[in-house]
Design a protein with these regions (language model features):
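Carbohydrate-active catalytic/glycan-binding domains of CAZyme proteins
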Residues: 1-341
């Protein structure tokens, strides 16, 4: 039976959306979307609770122009073959252009990769490995990677211009951490009512393998109170490139909870406690009234809670945990430690 190790502080990290936590040895590494969307940052701590106060180091900044000059979103850190990789989405700066996308239009992001071959990701050099060629040019974001039976895979969100919707989820095998070894295979597209509230979205994939089953979580709908998580499941012995291997939940598995003031939970990652418990890491807001462009509201906070499993080894997703750390409601940006800048 899973341990019920407490998450003593929630939010885990203030004003950081799309959180990714990687536990490597006894160290937790944390990255997420910065509220200015102009950089990629990294923290580390010996405990999850230590991440809020941990030093935040900027390892990469947006370009002055070109395809990586605007709206840097959803970095994820991975360790593959002894090197460190960060997948992230970036777009060309359309500020001031007459044809700049509005809030109701699709953005123009692509997926990019950074590599660091040093033993310590806070040392060495982060090298740009460029854009991941997914096979076609359209809005693409939220790449994650996992290994199964010796093969590395990439899962990401991308728009198919031939179908209704802003983004579907795709999977492909990898030749190396920045190159696909085969064509993209669609795993899911927005089809259920909960996935199409505001926007037709499947995004933010994360993969967990537990007791012979793969759980591919994702988020759907617009990033307000309707934002929620769904899940695809497959046997770890099945072919992950075969859509028939996967079963999709018809209803969301993790949703807003007014009783604890946690709204729009999603874009999750998974990590573990030192005791071996699975930890669900996600972002959420603590209020529903958003003034202006939701992208300019910095108060999507990284949260974490132990994910228990039932006697059959299936996740009990539950509901967002209540807060134990004060969370801001103003649009004022905090210093990385959570204090007022």
């Amino acid at each position: 039976m899973a341990h019920r190790a407490p998450m003593t502080m929630n939010p885990l990290v203030l004003q950081r959306a799309d959180p990714c936590v990687l536990r490597e040895g006894s160290t937790y590494y944390f990255t997420a979307s910065h509220p200015l969307y102009d950089r990629i940052t990294l923290r580390r701590a010996d405990s999850l609770d230590g991440l809020q106060a941990a030093e935040e180091v900027t390892i990469w900044r947006r370009h002055e122009s070109g395809p990586q000059s605007h709206l840097i979103w959803a970095p994820e850190i991975h360790r593959v073959g002894g090197a460190w990789y960060i997948y992230y989405a970036a777009a060309p700066d359309a500020t001031g252009r007459a044809d700049a996308p509005s809030i109701n239009e699709t953005f123009n992001h692509r997926v990019f990769v950074l590599e660091n071959t040093a033993q310590d990701p806070f040392e060495g050099e982060w090298v740009e490995r460029g854009q991941v060629d997914t096979g076609w040019e359209s809005f693409a974001l939220d790449a994650t990677s996992f290994e199964l039976a010796g093969q590395q895979y990439l899962v990401w969100a991308q728009e198919d211009l031939e179908v209704m919707g802003h983004s579907n989820l795709y999977i492909a095998p990898m030749e190396n951490p920045w190159t696909l070894a085969g064509p993209a295979v669609e795993l899911t597209r927005p089809e259920h009512e909960w996935e199409t509230r505001g926007f037709w979205v499947n995004e933010g994939p994360a993969v967990l393998e537990h007791e012979g089953t793969l759980y591919l979580t994702y988020s759907g709908a617009a990033t307000g109170i309707d934002y929620a998580m769904g899940v695809l499941t497959a046997s770890a012995d099945a072919d992950p490139l075969d859509p028939a291997s996967w079963t999709k939940s018809e209803t969301p598995v993790f949703v807003s909870d007014e009783s604890v003031e946690r709204y729009g939970p999603g874009h999750n990652s998974f990590t573990t406690t030192p005791e071996g418990d699975v930890v669900l890491v996600y972002h959420a807001r603590t209020y529903t009234e958003i003034e202006g462009d939701p992208l300019q509201d910095p108060n999507r906070h990284a949260c974490a809670q132990v994910l228990p499993f039932d006697e059959n080894g299936r996740p009990r997703w539950g509901t967002p945990a209540p807060g134990t750390r004060p969370a801001p409601r103003s649009r004022e940006l905090l210093a990385p430690t959570g204090e007022k800048a």
